[in-house]
Curated annotation (Swiss-Prot):
The keyword Transmembrane helix does not apply. It catalyses: cytidine(1402) in 16S rRNA + S-adenosyl-L-methionine = N(4)-methylcytidine(1402) in 16S rRNA + S-adenosyl-L-homocysteine + H(+). The gene is rsmH. It is found in: Cytoplasm. GO terms for molecular function: rRNA (cytosine-N4-)-methyltransferase activity. GO terms for biological process: rRNA base methylation. Its EC number is 2.1.1.199. Keywords: Cytoplasm, Methyltransferase, rRNA processing, S-adenosyl-L-methionine, Transferase. It is an enzyme of class 2 (transferase). Specifically methylates the N4 position of cytidine in position 1402 (C1402) of 16S rRNA. This is Ribosomal RNA small subunit methyltransferase H.
Amino acid sequence: MQSPHIPVLLQEVLDAFDDFDSGDFLDCTLGYGGHSKALLQAHEKLRLIACDKDLEALNFSKEFLKKFQDRISFNHIGFKDILTQIPTQNLRGILADIGVSSLQLDKNDRGFSLNSDFLDMRMDQNNLLSAKEVVNSYSKEALEQIFKDYGDLAPVASMLTQKIINARSQKEITSAKELSQIIGNAKLKGRNVSLALLVFQALRIEVNNELGELKSLLENIEKAKLKDCKLAIISFHSLEDRIVKNTFKRWEKDCICDERAIKCECGKGHSLGKILSKKAISASKEEISYNSRSSCAKMRIFYFR
């Protein structure tokens, strides 16, 4: 059985956890099982806690990883909540791949791709909010803010929003294909990506509360007070990467006094561990050549002492 999704930064993930000895490993975003399968093969004493809010992906991976079923517990739950639901005392590794899988992007009825006949974009099909509702019911001001914040489209956000408002006043926008035609194929100056792709990114982030979920995951990881545990997070756009980078920096700080303070008053001793990736780890040219979607991937690693 073959996975329909190519896991990004696979070798880099294996390298990050090459010193894993034994204990529990949490894959916060199991998806179609590519990373987890490689880790299970590499580490015979690894016990996998696998979770995903996409039930379709979870059911696929149960079959895909059947060979290792006695070492896996499967959980249909979003990654932001998993740390509150599992024992953490034996947790030695955590991986979170905060991206949309190839299958989700390519599957017509999920409504992620520009040519889809649907306008959905929900990673969890139980969620009530879809891209169709956002596009057709959000106010002009709300849509404009989403495009500015999540699509980095400030120079053209007002113009793009007006196009959508004008179109939906004539008839409901019901497909991704229709929306991409409304937006058009133009590109921002100096950016090698279409406006439509950036609009779709912004809508997907809004529909799935992606930044909020990532922040909640990081908060729950911090509250878990992990010891001797390595965390690797793969993100796909600058907003996510910035959140991870800044959180890791804060976790590493020994002194938490205001930077303007003349001398330390906190007593130090607040560091949770160490950043193991001073710079974000990116895909190699070789990987990008056979998996173009890996070109945006960035991985950062933190070790909890």
